[in-house]
Structure formats: structure tokens, C-alpha cells
Swiss-Prot record:
GO terms for molecular function: translation elongation factor activity. This is Elongation factor P. PANTHER family: ELONGATION FACTOR P, ELONGATION FACTOR P (EF-P) FAMILY PROTEIN. Pathway: Protein biosynthesis; polypeptide chain elongation. It is found in: Cytoplasm. GO terms for biological process: peptide biosynthetic process. GO terms for cellular component: cytoplasm. Keywords: Cytoplasm, Elongation factor, Protein biosynthesis. Its main location: cytoplasm. Signal peptide: none annotated. Belongs to the elongation factor P family. Involved in peptide bond synthesis. Stimulates efficient translation and peptide-bond synthesis on native or reconstituted 70S ribosomes in vitro. Probably functions indirectly by altering the affinity of the ribosome for aminoacyl-tRNA, thus increasing their reactivity as acceptors for peptidyl transferase. The keyword Protein biosynthesis applies.
Length: 186
């Protein structure tokens, strides 16, 4: 059990048979009446966001999440197959379960997989990955004086905005949180 006074961004709680993650919270102490905690909660399974108010000191069950480091071994049809490196147990995930991580995951890449009651909630990639550019327009010298960007397709099929000097075959570092270009990988 966790008190509503202890809510922080990222705290996971169980409500109505689902796991909810605290996205925002605000402790409110009105001049009259008792204090309360106003929260914005995101459902870990469906992604829906709701606002909910708790009395100060109200206790709710804290979700017990298990984080396992797993390796993406291969893709079978539409399913992404992950293997637990300790138990060699395989888990198959759909693109819906993977979310936006499908844009940046390669075979043999390790990721943290969050489980709740043996149900996969989320796949967490490292904050940056190195990907090879497979398609982009050639940059022409003198295109711009201030430095511009152009779209590039990387080996996973995702589109990343890159500087004009990046060409096909180069390896680039990409932020997995927002898909932005971080730099060249030498």
C-alpha cells in the first residue's frame, strides 16, 4: 500500500484491476477543508489518461512490477520474440504491445521489459540506439547557409530528420524517446 502523499511521477498503483502510472500530481491544501492530491493517471495497458483526486493520506495498492532484461532475438511474422537471458524463456509481443519502440529495435538488442502479473506492460529501450541510414536524399554542398535537415530512413524503417551531410550507409545515434538525431557514430 502507498499513501497518496507519497505519489511521485512514475509511481505505479493498482486501481479497478488495472495498473496506472502517475503522470502528474499536485498536493492541494485549501484554506478551508482537508488537503487532497490531484493526479493525472495513465493506464499501463490501454494508454488512456484520466484525472483522479485522492484525499491526503488515502492509501491505495502499489503495483508490483517486475523488470526483466531481455534480448530481442528475431521477428516472426508480426510478432517480436524476446528471450530472457537468465531463464531462456521466450516472450512474443505484438506491435501494439511494443508501442513506438518498434521504430528503433534491432535483432540482438537488449531491452527492459516490465511485467505485471505475467502480463507485459511496456518495453523500455536504452535512451539512444545506433542505426544505419538506408535511404536519404543526397546533400548538395551549398544547400543552406544555416544548416538544415532532411528525412532519412534507418534500417528499422523509421524516419529520422538528419543534417544535410548525412548519407546512405552512415551510422547515426537516435534518441528512442522522441526519434531525434543525436549525432554520427564513428
Amino acid at each position: 500500500m502507498i499513501s497518496s502523499n507519497d505519489f511521485r511521477t512514475g509511481t505505479s498503483i493498482e486501481l479497478d484491476g488495472s495498473v496506472w502510472r502517475v503522470v502528474e500530481f499536485l498536493h492541494v491544501k485549501p484554506g478551508k477543508g482537508s488537503a487532497f492530491v490531484r493526479t493525472k493517471l495513465k493506464n499501463a495497458q490501454t494508454g488512456s489518461v484520466v484525472e483522479r483526486t485522492f484525499r491526503a493520506g488515502e492509501t491505495v495498492p502499489q503495483a508490483t512490477l517486475e523488470k526483466r532484461t531481455m534480448q530481442h532475438t528475431y521477428k516472426e511474422g508480426e510478432q517480436y520474440v524476446f528471450m530472457d537471458m537468465e531463464t531462456y524463456e521466450e516472450v512474443r509481443l505484438s506491435p501494439e504491445q511494443m508501442g513506438t519502440t518498434v521504430n528503433y529495435i534491432k535483432e540482438e538488442m537488449e531491452a527492459d521489459v516490465l511485467f505485471w502479473n505475467d502480463t507485459v506492460l511496456e518495453v523500455q529501450l536504452p535512451t539512444s540506439v545506433i542505426l544505419e541510414v538506408t535511404d536519404t536524399d543526397p546533400g548538395v554542398k551549398g544547400d543552406t547557409a544555416t544548416g538544415g535537415t532532411k528525412p532519412a530512413i534507418v534500417e528499422t524503417g523509421a524516419q529520422v530528420m538528419v543534417p544535410l551531410f548525412i548519407s546512405i550507409g552512415e551510422k547515426i545515434k537516435v534518441d528512442t524517446r522522441d526519434g531525434s538525431y543525436l549525432g554520427r557514430e564513428t
